[in-house]
Swiss-Prot record:
A family per Pfam: SH3_2
Disordered: annotated segments: 1-22, 215-240, 295-364, 697-811, 1251-1273, 1292-1325, 1392-1413
Subunit-level organization: Interacts with LRGUK (via guanylate kinase-like domain). Interacts (via C-terminus) with HOOK1 (via coiled-coil region). May interact with FASLG.
Biological role stated in the UniProt entry: Probable component of the manchette, a microtubule-based structure which plays a key role in sperm head morphogenesis during late stages of sperm development.
Record's compositionally biased regions (Polar residues): 707-718, 761-775, 1293-1305
Gene: RIMBP3C
Species name: Homo sapiens (Human)
Low complexity biased stretches: 776-790
Entry's family note: Belongs to the RIMBP family.
Protein name stated in the entry: RIMS-binding protein 3C
Domain Fibronectin type-III per the UniProt entry, residue ranges: 995-1083, 1088-1184
Main location, first listed in the record: cytoplasm
């Protein structure tokens, strides 16, 4: 470019006079401007190319969007068509089902109407026939009467002519009547058949789908059908019946036509308006019901019309009336032509007859009606099919649209696109703002004054700035335009979706045959969105680059530092903005999964919380249900036990009654033998009377007294300890010769207090009984037994006779001869026994089957009855209620209260004096007397085995200090007894104690606890206080309460108080409440393991116990406590522990099972620092596990007779047939007069079963103390030694025992029933050895005979045990007996020290275990040393004197300690030299301790039947918690089965780990049933015919069969047992419990 060339911008060239710097600057500006122009042009070319490319891209996008739209439309159309087809198909099926239902209903209506029509036709026909015959008969009679034949002068010709004419008339009449009637009936039958065929053809045509025929129904047919039939009878005022019948049929056919036309209307309407099909169909369905009702109503109205029409007024009108049945237009017999009938049905001449073939019955041809019917059916089927298809298609489309939910997804996509569009719009606006700011900055930079700048340069800068601003605005508008296009595409897609979702259109039918399309693909929308976003971002980057490149245009030569700084700041800001945007996107991407994870975690947390709450609630409910089930099971088992014992007692009583009757018969025979010589007695009467007078005149003889006993002075009664017997003169004479025998018997009875079999009574013969003393049934049985006892007493005693008599008495129940034994044990008969019973059920004697209910007492459940004497042969007691009423009481409705035996409460004045002989006015004295006697017996110490026999109130008064005070208390006791208070619970010596006793806490957890108590009265409620705040009120009769919602680790104080009514509060009751404290656990207990399984190991004699470990958290805790391991229990006894929180199995060897044959189930508990969990679900031990262990063969019963003072008896014990019955100590009545066989008598007493009821005389023999001294005391010690030997033998255990034997607490027994378990070895397992060291020598032959007889004896049923107040009361009572036994050991000492030394000598191959405080002279051996090894190397044997010989005083009581941890002195003792004197014990084992700690903090203790020292730091003293009420010792643990620690407490504190418990009391206290071995007493055949069909599944028994019994007795009195390999039901009343001397 030349210097003088004009400037492109119109600027003039520089003048020569200008300075060169300005020209240079201007030149530079021009060059820069040219450069900028070139760049601008290049940029514009690039922009144009970019625009073209964008336009092509836009067209491509539009085409793709159009294609996608078409695809979306095709998919929507195909889906809509598929949905419509499905909905139409469903609608068609529904319509078809409705149609079938309508057809079935129509068929039922038609059949019903046809049956009605047939019945009407038959009745009409019968009536018409009868009427026609009657008319014929009347006509014949009239013709005969009025004819010539009836005249006297008529000839035979005229008569014959009359008869011929009569026959012709009758024939014509018969032809007219019968012919027309028969034709009419045939016609109606044919009409019915045709109508049935038409209807069937109509139905078949609907199902077969015949081709359509042209034709339309006549709308006037409906009106013509609804018109009534015209009266067509020509000579009658009544409408003919066949016309009415025909009208009903025609109306029915007309209704069918209406139905067909309605359906035809539906088919015609289907083509015009498919939407109205449903309403039309509904109307068509509804139009049939009223028509059918009208037809039925018309049919029902026919009989009424017929009755009204059959009333002929006279014989003249009968002939026309007989022709009413024939149609008037036709007199001929055949049916009328169809035209006539059509006139009848349609008088207007057949309008619409071609289109409605069903309007008439048979006038139209069958072909035409069938054709039209097929046509109508086809039209209906077609319309129905179209409608069903349409409805089904619509329904499917609607379901698909609702199920797909695409509109909602599309809406969400649209919302997201809108949000992104808003963001892009904001970004574009921000870019525009920034461009505007840059433009302003450039303008300010350009407008800055530059020295030497010309006006042309300024204008050029302005123009460039404006151009730059336009370019920037165009660049900003490009993304906005793209956004608008995207928005338009979105709107089009949304509109398309809205049109598709709005419903199908008519134009969519054209695309029915096209390809199947789908909904708008969400991926395509996402792809378009991503592409648009990428495009916008690319434009933004280009804009930013252009801004960066074009920022230097307004500057001249880069001299403006401000523009460069601004550009750098802008670039930095843009980069920072992009970086922040990317970070935001990344954070948003990361936030979405995090948000989803948070929502999922929250959802899982809520679900876990809900599940936890549900599980807690379910656990609580199941726990409550389990507690309730356990309680119900316990109650049921107790009731079953009572019922079983009652049934056994009833059966045994029946046998005893038969035996008593036999004895009575024998006694009567003997009395008759004594009275066989009355004449001789009369002759000898006078000399005998003189002899009696002479004897009475002797000095010192008591004066003669009348037969009735006179009242003795009270001072004389006080001076005597034994009731005196005043005999009658006659009896005195008879008894005088036998006085020597009587004195001998009394001396022998005093010398030996153990009476074992025979009675030694005073000879007495009561031959005369005054008539003024009526005897009850009980008194008669007593007199019989006493008379027979006197007969036995008069016979001289000899060894043979005594043996026979003993065997006879042994066959009977001991209580059956209790009265005879009482009279035989003293000079006078003892008073009847007073026992207290409680009524178990309500009983009204007048509702029973007895013949004399007036002599029985009505009973109410819970009442106390005072029983005198024993049960009679009918099973009744003589009793008295609290209100003084006396009478007979049925034994099966009452149950005896424990320790309620009261010795004779009446003065013994006559051998026949019974309770029934007392006057009614002496009731109060009797009650007071019984209470005083009860107090006297309550004063007797249980451990001293003494019983004070009280004869009268004055004798008791000598033993009591303050009689007046006690008399007042007795009066109050009587009044309280009448108010429902239990006399045994009223207190000792009249102390009125109403406070609940034996409070015990059980099931103590962190938040709950259960308290139980024993109430003094079941008629008053109790208030439970928690921390001296009233917590709850329990109703009367409830003795337990459960605390809920307690705080963990908190000390609580519970007080239970009885709430009495206001009238009883006036009496001073002493204490009315009891208090107990407890602490809740800190946490826990842990949950028990699951899925416990017991399997046999591959090795013999090994069991594998597996379980599912409890779920623990990361800290190893379950339910908040640390899990330390698991403990395995077998039937409640711990056998092993596993010190691993995750252990799942363990192995049990046969040597670990102490009494394996008794075990049935194994449970596992979870151990923790806060105790053990509840038992898991028990697992059954395999039955074949014990079969693999064969015990060595045992020889039969044998004995050895060695030293004269000692002998050994060996009893074989069968592992499968050992006794399960709990034998108890008892002393059978025995005649000590025969001194030649004491050992045989000992064996008899040794093996006898416990009696059901123990009489005071038998108690006198076994535990009472005779009034005599000297030889009597020695005999008593000897008897106690023998008794101890017998009991210790019976209570030994062996590994073969099914169950450890136990002792049942018999009423009235005060014998110490505490047993010790030995730990000595035995040379031969399976044998029980008895080594006696006391008693005189017996001849071998007598020993053998006695032993054989003992083995032959059949065992009686298990003794009746009265209801126990609680399991732990028995244990507490036995524990108290142990404590008293120590005191008793100070007073008792067997003769000689030689036997003591012999007792200390060890047996070869065995070690003798000696129990603490033993007072028996026998050695006990037990084959269980392999299972229970000796715990210490040094055996410290207990001397006979008890602990007082070891340094403790006689009055030092034993205390109970519990071991806090395991202790082995050989390993853990600090002084190894003294370790031999220390005992080995295990954790939670109970120890008996005497005295206090020594200087080394050691106690003197007894453990495992060894005495030694124990460290005081490892034991803690237990509060036994017994209290003495009513001379009974009770434990707080009443009402539940105690834990192992409590059981060990009350079992004598000698049970180490690995040994079984010697449970005392009834076997029903055991939680699980074990098999029992019983013996059949009688034969039983279930198939003898008496059982009927009930004998199936029962076993046949023979007397002596041994039966294995499984489980308790059922409701019908049967056991489930096994005999000879067969299992079934056996009757419980025919089974006896076996003892050791059984089979």
């Amino acid at each position: 470019m030349a210097k003088d060339s004009p400037s492109p911008l119109g600027a003039s060239p520089k003048k020569p006079g200008c300075s060169s710097p300005a020209a240079a600057v201007l030149e530079n500006q021009r060059r820069e401007l040219e450069k900028l122009r070139a760049e601008l042009e290049a940029e514009r070319a690039g922009w144009r190319a970019e625009r073209r490319r964008f336009a092509a891209r836009e067209r491509q996008l539009r085409e793709e969007a159009e294609r996608e739209r078409r695809q979306l439309a095709d998919r929507l159309r195909s889906k809509w068509e598929a949905q419509r087809s499905r909905e139409l198909r469903q609608l068609q099926e529904e319509m078809q089902r409705e149609r079938e239902a309508e057809i079935r209903q129509l068929l039922r209506w038609k059949e019903a109407e046809q049956r009605q029509l047939q019945q009407l036709l038959h009745r009409e026909r019968d009536g018409v026939v009868r009427q026609a015959r009657e008319l014929q008969r009347q006509l014949a009679e009239e013709l005969v009467n009025r004819g010539h034949c009836s005249r006297p002068g008529a000839s035979e010709v005229s008569a014959a002519q009359c008869r011929c004419r009569l026959q012709e008339v009758l024939a014509q009449l018969r032809w007219q009547t019968d012919g027309e009637q028969a034709a009419r009936i045939r016609y109606l039958q044919a009409a019915l058949e045709v109508e049935r065929q038409l209807f069937l053809k109509y139905i078949l045509a609907h199902f077969r789908g015949h081709p359509a025929l042209s034709g339309s129904p006549d709308p006037q047919a409906v009106h013509s059908l609804e018109e009534p039939l015209p009266q067509t009878s020509s000579g009658s005022c009544h409408a003919p019946k066949p016309a009415c019948q025909l009208g009903s049929l025609d109306s029915l056919s007309a209704e069918v036509g209406v139905r067909s036309r309605s359906l035809g209307l539906v088919s015609s309407a289907c083509s015009s308006s498919p939407d109205g099909l449903l309403s039309t169909h509904a109307s068509s369905l509804d139009c049939f019901a009223p028509a059918c009702s009208r037809s039925l109503d018309s049919t029902r109205s026919l009989p009424k019309a017929s009755k009204s029409e059959e009333r002929p007024s006279s014989p003249d009108t009968s002939t026309p009336g007989s022709r009413r049945l024939s149609p008037p237009p036709s007199p001929l017999p055949p049916p009328p032509p169809p035209s006539a009938h059509r006139k009848l049905s349609n008088p207007r001449g057949g309008e619409g007859s071609e289109s409605q073939p069903c309007e008439v019955l048979t006038p139209s041809p069958p072909g035409l009606g069938h054709h039209e019917l097929i046509k109508l059916n086809w039209l209906l089927a077609k319309a129905l099919w179209v409608l069903a298809r349409r409805c089904y298609t619509l329904q499917e489309e609607n379901k698909q649209l609702r199920r797909a939910g695409c509109p909602y997804q599309a809406d969400e996509k649209v919302k997201r696109l809108k949000v992104k569009r808003a963001e892009l719009t904001g970004l574009a606006r921000r870019l525009a703002d920034r461009a505007r700011e840059l433009q302003e900055t450039n303008l300010r930079a350009v407008s800055a004054p530059i020295p030497g700048e010309s006006c042309a340069g300024l204008e050029l800068c302005q123009v460039f700035a404006r151009q730059r601003a336009r370019d920037l605005s165009e660049q900003a508008s490009a993304p906005l335009a793209k956004d608008k296009q995207i928005e338009e595409l979105r709107q089009e897609c949304h509109l398309l979706q809205a049109r598709v979702a709005s419903g199908p259109c008519s134009d969519l039918h054209t695309g029915r045959g096209g390809p199947c399309t789908q909904w708008l693909n969400v991926r395509d929308l996402d792809r378009l969105q991503r592409e648009s976003q990428r495009e916008v971002l690319r434009l933004q980057r280009q804009l930013m680059l252009q801004q960066g490149n074009g920022g230097a245009w307004p500057e001249a030569g880069g001299q403006s530092a401000t523009c460069e700084e601004v550009r750098r700041q802008m670039l930095a800001l843009e980069r920072e903005l992009d970086q922040r945007r990317r970070e935001c996107q990344e954070l948003g991407t990361q936030a979405a999964p995090a948000r989803r994870r948070g929502e999922e975690a929250e959802t899982q947390l809520q679900a876990a919380l809900l599940k936890n709450a549900w599980l807690a609630e379910e656990n609580g409910r199941l726990q409550a249900k389990t507690d309730w089930v356990r309680k119900v099971e316990a109650e049921n088992s107790e009731v079953r036990g009572h019922l079983g014992r009652a049934c056994q007692e009833r059966d045994a009583s029946g046998l005893i009654a038969e035996q008593l009757l036999q004895q009575a018969a024998r006694g009567q025979d003997r009395q008759q033998q004594l009275q066989r010589d009355p004449q001789k007695a009369l002759c000898d009467l006078h000399p005998s009377w003189k002899e009696i007078q002479a004897l009475q005149c002797r000095p010192g003889h008591p004066p003669e007294q009348p037969w009735e006993t006179s009242q003795m002075p009270e001072s004389q009664v006080k001076g005597s300890r034994r009731p005196k017997f005043h005999a009658r003169p006659e009896d005195y004479a008879v008894s005088q010769p036998n006085r020597d025998i009587q004195e001998k018997r009394e001396a022998s009875l005093e010398e030996s207090p153990v009476a074992l079999g025979e009675s030694a009574s005073v000879p007495q013969v009561s031959e005369t009984v005054p008539a003024s003393q009526p005897l009850s049934k009980k008194t008669s049985s007593q007199s019989n037994s006493s008379s027979e006892g006197s007969m036995w007493a008069t016979v001289p005693s000899s060894p043979t006779l005594d043996r026979d008599t003993a065997s006879e008495v042994d066959d009977l129940e001991p209580d059956s001869v209790s009265l005879a034994l009482e009279m035989g044990g003293s000079a006078a008969p003892a008073a009847p026994k007073l026992k207290i019973f409680m009524a178990q059920y309500n009983y009204n004697p007048f509702e029973g089957p007895n013949d004399h209910p007036e002599g029985e007492l009505p009973l109410t459940a819970g009442d106390y009855i005072y029983i005198f004497g024993d049960m009679d042969e009918d099973g009744f007691y003589e009793g008295e209620l609290d209100d003084g009423r006396r009478g007979l009481v049925p034994s099966n409705f009452v149950e005896q209260i424990p320790d309620s035996y009261i010795p004779g409460c009446l003065p013994a004045k006559s051998p026949d004096l019974g309770p029934s002989q007392l006057p009614a006015g002496q009731d109060e004295a009797l009650e007071e007397d019984s209470l005083l006697s009860g107090k006297a017996q309550g004063m007797v110490d249980r451990g001293l085995c003494q019983m004070v026999r009280v004869g009268s109130k004055t004798e008791v008064a000598t033993e009591i200090l303050d009689t007046k005070t006690e008399a007042c208390q007795l009066g109050l006791l009587q009044s309280m007894g009448k108010q429902g208070l239990s006399r045994p619970l009223l207190g000792t010596k009249g102390v009125l104690r109403m406070a609940p006793m034996q409070l015990h806490l059980q099931n103590v957890t962190a938040t709950s606890a259960n308290i139980t108590w024993v109430y003094s009265s079941h008629r008053h409620p109790h208030v439970v206080y928690l921390d001296d705040r009233e917590h709850a009120l329990t109703p009367a009769g409830v003795s337990c309460y459960t605390f809920q919602g307690l705080c963990p680790g908190t000390h609580y104080r519970v007080r239970v108080e009885v709430r009495l009514p206001w009238d009883l509060l006036q009496v001073y009751w002493g204490t009315m409440s009891s208090t107990v404290t407890f602490d809740t656990l800190l946490a826990g207990p842990p949950y028990p393991p699951l899925d416990v399984l017991v399997e046999r190991h591959a090795s013999p004699g090994v069991l594998v116990v597996s379980w599912l470990p409890v779920t623990i958290d990361s800290a190893g805790s379950s339910n908040g406590v640390q899990v330390t391991g698991y403990a395995v229990y077998a039937d409640g006894l711990k056998v092993c522990e596993v010190a691993d929180a995750t252990a799942g199995s363990t192995v049990l060897e046969f040597s670990q099972l102490q009494v394996p044959l008794t075990w049935q189930k194994v449970s596992v508990r979870t151990m923790s620092l806060c105790g053990e969990s509840l038992d898991s679900v028990p697992a059954q031990i395999p039955e074949d596990f014990f079969m693999c262990h064969r015990w060595p063969e045992t020889p039969p019963f044998s004995y050895t007779c060695g030293d004269p003072s000692t002998y050994r008896v060996t009893f074989p014990v069968c592992p499968q047939k050992l006794s399960l019955a709990p034998p108890s100590a008892k002393a059978s009545p025995h005649n000590p007069g025969s001194c030649g066989e004491p050992q045989a008598k000992f064996l008899e007493a040794f093996f006898e079963e416990p009696p059901r009821r123990q009489s005071p005389v038998s108690n006198l023999g076994s535990e009472g103390e005779c009034p005599s001294s000297g030889a009597g005391s020695q005999a008593q010690e000897l008897a106690e030694a023998w008794e101890g030997c017998r009991k210790d033998l019976l209570f030994q255990k062996s590994p073969q025992n099914h169950r450890p034997p136990s002792v049942s607490d018999q009423p009235g027994e005060k014998e110490n029933c505490y047993q010790h378990m030995g730990t000595s070895k035995s040379p031969a397992p399976g044998f029980i050895h008895l080594r006696t060291e006391c008693g005189p020598r017996k001849e071998p032959c007598q020993e053998k005979a006695a032993l054989e007889r003992v083995l032959r004896q059949k065992q009686d049923a298990q003794g009746f045990t009265p209801p126990q107040l609680g399991a732990s009361q028995q244990y507490a009572s036995d524990f108290h007996n142990v404590l008293k036994e120590e005191q008793e050991a100070l007073c008792l000492d067997l003769r000689g020290t030689e036997r003591r030394e012999e007792r200390r000598e060890p047996e070869p191959h065995s070690r003798q275990g000696q129990a603490l405080g033993v007072k028996r002279g026998c050695q006990l051996h037990e084959p269980s040393s392999a299972l229970c090894p000796a715990p210490s190397a040094k055996v410290i044997k207990m001397p006979r004197g008890g602990p007082q010989q070891l340094g403790t005083g006689a009055n030092t009581p034993a205390r109970v300690f519990v071991a806090l941890s395991d202790y082995n002195p050989l390993v853990m003792s600090a002084n190894l030299k003294a370790a031999e004197e220390e005992l080995v014990f295990q954790k939670r084992q109970l120890l008996r301790v005497w005295g206090s700690q020594d200087t080394h903090d050691f106690y003197l203790s007894e453990c495992n039947r060894q005495v030694g020292n124990i460290p005081g730091r490892l034991v803690a003293e237990m509060e036994v918690g017994t209290e003495q009420t009513d001379r009974r010792w009770r434990s707080p643990a009443q009402g539940h089965l105690p834990s192992v620690a409590h059981l060990e407490d009350f079992q004598g504190l000698i049970i180490p780990q690995g040994s079984s418990l010697v449970l005392q009391g009834n076997s029903k206290r055991l939680p699980l049933w074990t098999p029992k071995i019983m013996i059949a007493a009688l034969d039983y055949d279930p198939g003898d015919g008496q059982m009927g069909g009930q004998g199936k599944g029962r076993l046949a028994l023979r007397a002596g069969d041994v039966v294995m019994v499984y489980g308790p007795m059922d409701d019908q009195g049967f056991y489930y047992g096994e005999l000879g390999g067969h299992r079934g039901l056996v009757p419980a009343h025919l089974l006896d419990h076996m003892s050791l001397h059984g089979h």
